[in-house]
Amino acid sequence: MPKRDDIKTILVVGSGPIIIGQAAEFDYAGTQACLALKEEGYRVILVNSNPATIMTDKEIADKVYIEPLTHDFIARIIRKEQPDALLPTLGGQTGLNMAIQLHDSGVLEANNVKLLGTELESIQQAEDREMFRTLMNDLNVPVPESDIVNTVEQAFEFKEQVGYPLIVRPAFTMGGTGGGICHNDAELKEVVSNGLHYSPATQCLIEKSIAGYKEIEYEVMRDKNDNAIVVCNMENIDPVGIHTGDSIVVAPSQTLSDVEYQMLRDVSLKVIRALGIEGGCNVQLALDPHSLNYYIIEVNPRVSRSSALASKATGYPIAKLAAKIAVGLTLDEMLNPITGTSYAAFEPTLDYVISKIPRFPFDKFEKGERELGTQMKATGEVMAIGRTYEESLLKAIRSLEYGVHHLGLSNGESYELDYIKERIGHQDDERLFFIGEAIRRGTSLEELHNMTKIDYFFLNKFQNIIDIEHELKNHQGDLEYLKYAKDYGFSDKVIAHRWDKEEKDIYQLRMSQNIKPVYKMVDTCAAEFESTTPYYYGTYEYENESIVTDKEKILVLGSGPIRIGQGVEFDYATVHAVWAIQNAGYEAIIVNNNPETVSTDFSISDKLYFEPLTEEDVMNIINLEQPKGVVVQFGGQTAINLADKLAQHGVKILGTSLEDLNRAEDRKEFEALLREIAVPQPQGKTATSPKEALENAREIGYPVVVRPSYVLGGRAMEIVDNDQELENYMTQAVKASPEHPVLVDRYLTGKEIEVDAISDGETVVIPGIMEHIERAGVHSGDSIAVYPPQTLTQDEINTLEDYTIKLAKGLNIKGLINIQFVIAHDGVYVLEVNPRSSRTVPFLSKITDIQMAQLAMRAIMGETLAEIGFKQGIQPYSEGVYVKAPVFSFNKLKNVDITLGPEMKSTGEVMGKDLTLEKALYKGLTGSGFEVKDHGTVLMTVSDKDKDEIVKIAHRLNEIGYKILATRGTAQKLKDHNIPVEVVGKIGGEDDLLTRIQNGEVQIVINTMTKGKEIERDGFQIRRTTVENGVPCLTSLDTASALTNVIESMTFTMRNV
């Protein structure tokens, strides 16, 4: 069947900012799809609000709009561009919901826009819980006993019929937003009211819990001729009850009999045929472990997290082929790009095992509720490939970067067995490691199976890992056992620990005895056809399939799993670096382990090694490939942390030298450099003990900022005001980084400025300066950044330029550097310097059209910036105003305080661009999910130090016509200035403010932190209540003031004559 010729222009909707439940997998899918459509000759228009993606690069589509993903903005683009068709199935839940809204409002019909891919009716049948249930009943496919409710009362009626436990699933949401498992009336009331709030259709499905069943997924493809195949089937190690995004997953499934496998396969294909899906689709099923009974849980009629995993697990490019199916091509006429000889209608087969483990943010949010359920909490994931299940699991564990390298906890031996069992009884992110500890203590697999419902197959594999540990301990120095342990994925570090040796001893022993891994190809067909892909994994076998060429090579380290503080921005830089390396004529090799990203698409680099980012795993690749050098500055802290270790093996680190990287990180050396080049910094000291920290703080004067050295994303960083707070911090934070001391700095309140620059050692190019809306003290990743700066004097800009050039030259930077400054009372001070690619590189690259990561890579390879055509200093400004606004995922993380401070908390970002600051801010806030209303009620409760400042904001909001509520102290201050205000009661009292928020009477909350136990708890409760009820809460007065500017620009002033 030829492709459709009745359409020329296609609008593709992206998925927007990275949030929990919707991460980098959609950048990968969207990029693939746009390129596939262009390949077929269509004109592609893309709209997405996330600047940190490869997808929003100009080369990916014919026209790129970085605009908020709301009905109104997309409608404007449709009216302006007049596309013939809209492809919504590659933009996650956001894309689907937009398609439904644009259809319902009549915009698509009025502009003659057709929907491509899966029909709208099918999307609604899969997403609307009522319609889906009806269809399943018609097909005789069992679904769990359930009911659709639109009110809390209806939920209680259903509970009377079936009893607890119950699972609540809101309609039209992703990542299980608002859903959960309920065991009692209180939980049912909370979860259902939450779920109705988050569901655009105010609809929840309530079903009898089948927790304990096996959860199986099939990733399927279908075209318009009804050809349908299974691309990959996957098994969740965790039984039903934990969201698949939070489950440990293995592919292919390990515990299904052939009868079970074929039965579930047939059902999956039957369902997507009945739904009429064209493209990729994910089917989730629950199988009773003791019979052939099964239920269908849900169907995602779109490309998803699971399809990104399935693509990387099999090498089969689902998103690319789904896009081509959407324009009418069929599976039997498209070649499989991996083999280049077989067709896309062949089902992939695997001769290896894949393990995926989610990456959770609890190392950042130690107080967050860790218990896992049907609402997703992971920010990202890692994948590993091995020849045995044990090997793939252990490789995945050491890819997580939790400081855990094995099936156990770093201080596991210190726990009591009772505590270990108690932790296993709760489903949380550490359960796997506690199971390892329990097996070490001799707990029977039967007991573990009864507690967890994890299949005996997996428990036996865990047991095998522990058995090998014992064998190692009993056979110290025995090469046979060393080889055996390597076959099952043990790292040198773990073997060294069992043999009471150093990791390097084991490495040297392996080298001397030639015990090295070989690299196998991922080819979709278990080596049945000749394959051309350069996609490899390491394993301890005999034949090496990775053929080393005689071309000069450069190895780029990726940034691993997505987590808070290290997002898709680093993947963006990695991909651009690879393109620059290829353009310069070198062979580009990537090492990375994140299945969601563009960098792990085999078509990006000349060779892709899907391996853990550890010293051992990277050295094994270097020993084989012998690259000219390794690039670490694009892979975030993950890659930087490996530089030292690789250099000790004699590996050449390209770009800024290791000495200079360390000079930027080492406090004393950095201070010496600043004195030498005369760049001021806030007064600061280094402390290695609580006593020393107190002496330092008293000498400098409070408030001080305290943080461990060598961390990313402001981990364990705090602003403290007195001795007591400092003592509390020191007893908890010193463990944050034992080999490295704690830094104590004077805390300067002032404007925070961020600068990214590129240097070749001679010329320093500054693409732009960004000014933060929030004053210093809020982490740069959580601040709203504005380009070009709006309130700086020319003198200040000249000073910033001068200091940036001095720092880049003083540190001998080759490549990228990111600097944060503060402008306080009497001048410009440097806060910190990062000699690497930063979070703002994609944002600035998009604005200025200077491909910063590529330019940096060219400088690293020896080109001079002057030859390329750049002059030193700040580059000419782009027209317009650009805003980078942070996006948070607090609604998915219970018990996490949303107050902004020096620890980073946002998971993603959006860009707003327009001709004025207010319009750009409006777009940034709207794109980040903040509904800006020109009237309503604002609730204010601020700390004493902020009371003077809140008066101005209250006055302006009152002028616009906002109604003001305030707690007693704040209200008194406003009354003193003749601002009309209504006093609300304290928590727990009459007419308390939480009830007001819960009843939907408040549109905005402004709440700043007051220290002190009781008040802090109240403040925390207020902030969490706003999150649970979807009310915007501002914890910084600078953000509140900026929002007030936006509202003022939307309204007319009303004053009597």
Swiss-Prot record:
<dbReference type="InterPro" id="IPR011607">
    <property type="entry name" value="MGS-like_dom"/>
</dbReference>
<comment type="function">
    <text>Large subunit of the glutamine-dependent carbamoyl phosphate synthetase (CPSase). CPSase catalyzes the formation of carbamoyl phosphate from the ammonia moiety of glutamine, carbonate, and phosphate donated by ATP, constituting the first step of 2 biosynthetic pathways, one leading to arginine and/or urea and the other to pyrimidine nucleotides.</text>
</comment>
<dbReference type="InterPro" id="IPR005479">
    <property type="entry name" value="CbamoylP_synth_lsu-like_ATP-bd"/>
</dbReference>
<keyword id="KW-0665">Pyrimidine biosynthesis</keyword>
<dbReference type="GO" id="GO:0044205">
    <property type="term" value="P:'de novo' UMP biosynthetic process"/>
</dbReference>
<feature type="domain" description="MGS-like">
    <location>
        <begin position="930"/>
        <end position="1057"/>
    </location>
</feature>
<feature type="binding site">
    <location>
        <position position="779"/>
    </location>
    <ligand>
        <name>ATP 2</name>
    </ligand>
</feature>
<feature type="binding site">
    <location>
        <position position="284"/>
    </location>
    <ligand>
        <name>Mn(2+) 1</name>
    </ligand>
</feature>
<keyword id="KW-0464">Manganese</keyword>
<dbReference type="GO" id="GO:0046872">
    <property type="term" value="F:metal ion binding"/>
</dbReference>
<dbReference type="InterPro" id="IPR005483">
    <property type="entry name" value="CbamoylP_synth_lsu_CPSase_dom"/>
</dbReference>
<dbReference type="GO" id="GO:0005524">
    <property type="term" value="F:ATP binding"/>
</dbReference>
<protein>
    <recommendedName>
        <fullName>Carbamoyl phosphate synthase large chain</fullName>
        <ecNumber>6.3.4.16</ecNumber>
        <ecNumber>6.3.5.5</ecNumber>
    </recommendedName>
</protein>
<dbReference type="Pfam" id="PF02787">
    <property type="entry name" value="CPSase_L_D3"/>
</dbReference>
<keyword id="KW-0055">Arginine biosynthesis</keyword>
<feature type="binding site">
    <location>
        <position position="832"/>
    </location>
    <ligand>
        <name>ATP 2</name>
    </ligand>
</feature>
<feature type="binding site">
    <location>
        <position position="169"/>
    </location>
    <ligand>
        <name>ATP 1</name>
    </ligand>
</feature>
<dbReference type="GO" id="GO:0006541">
    <property type="term" value="P:glutamine metabolic process"/>
</dbReference>
<dbReference type="InterPro" id="IPR033937">
    <property type="entry name" value="MGS_CPS_CarB"/>
</dbReference>
<feature type="binding site">
    <location>
        <position position="748"/>
    </location>
    <ligand>
        <name>ATP 2</name>
    </ligand>
</feature>
<feature type="binding site">
    <location>
        <position position="780"/>
    </location>
    <ligand>
        <name>ATP 2</name>
    </ligand>
</feature>
<feature type="binding site">
    <location>
        <position position="752"/>
    </location>
    <ligand>
        <name>ATP 2</name>
    </ligand>
</feature>
<feature type="binding site">
    <location>
        <position position="832"/>
    </location>
    <ligand>
        <name>Mn(2+) 3</name>
    </ligand>
</feature>
<feature type="binding site">
    <location>
        <position position="820"/>
    </location>
    <ligand>
        <name>ATP 2</name>
    </ligand>
</feature>
<feature type="binding site">
    <location>
        <position position="284"/>
    </location>
    <ligand>
        <name>ATP 1</name>
    </ligand>
</feature>
<feature type="binding site">
    <location>
        <position position="298"/>
    </location>
    <ligand>
        <name>Mn(2+) 1</name>
    </ligand>
</feature>
<dbReference type="InterPro" id="IPR011761">
    <property type="entry name" value="ATP-grasp"/>
</dbReference>
<feature type="binding site">
    <location>
        <position position="834"/>
    </location>
    <ligand>
        <name>Mn(2+) 4</name>
    </ligand>
</feature>
<dbReference type="InterPro" id="IPR036897">
    <property type="entry name" value="CarbamoylP_synth_lsu_oligo_sf"/>
</dbReference>
<dbReference type="GO" id="GO:0004088">
    <property type="term" value="F:carbamoyl-phosphate synthase (glutamine-hydrolyzing) activity"/>
</dbReference>
<comment type="similarity">
    <text>Belongs to the CarB family.</text>
</comment>
<feature type="binding site">
    <location>
        <position position="778"/>
    </location>
    <ligand>
        <name>ATP 2</name>
    </ligand>
</feature>
<dbReference type="InterPro" id="IPR016185">
    <property type="entry name" value="PreATP-grasp_dom_sf"/>
</dbReference>
<dbReference type="Pfam" id="PF02786">
    <property type="entry name" value="CPSase_L_D2"/>
</dbReference>
<feature type="domain" description="ATP-grasp 1">
    <location>
        <begin position="133"/>
        <end position="327"/>
    </location>
</feature>
<comment type="subunit">
    <text>Composed of two chains; the small (or glutamine) chain promotes the hydrolysis of glutamine to ammonia, which is used by the large (or ammonia) chain to synthesize carbamoyl phosphate. Tetramer of heterodimers (alpha,beta)4.</text>
</comment>
<feature type="binding site">
    <location>
        <position position="298"/>
    </location>
    <ligand>
        <name>Mn(2+) 2</name>
    </ligand>
</feature>
<feature type="binding site">
    <location>
        <position position="300"/>
    </location>
    <ligand>
        <name>Mn(2+) 2</name>
    </ligand>
</feature>
<comment type="pathway">
    <text>Amino-acid biosynthesis; L-arginine biosynthesis; carbamoyl phosphate from bicarbonate: step 1/1.</text>
</comment>
<dbReference type="Pfam" id="PF02142">
    <property type="entry name" value="MGS"/>
</dbReference>
<feature type="region of interest" description="Carboxyphosphate synthetic domain">
    <location>
        <begin position="1"/>
        <end position="401"/>
    </location>
</feature>
<dbReference type="GO" id="GO:0006526">
    <property type="term" value="P:L-arginine biosynthetic process"/>
</dbReference>
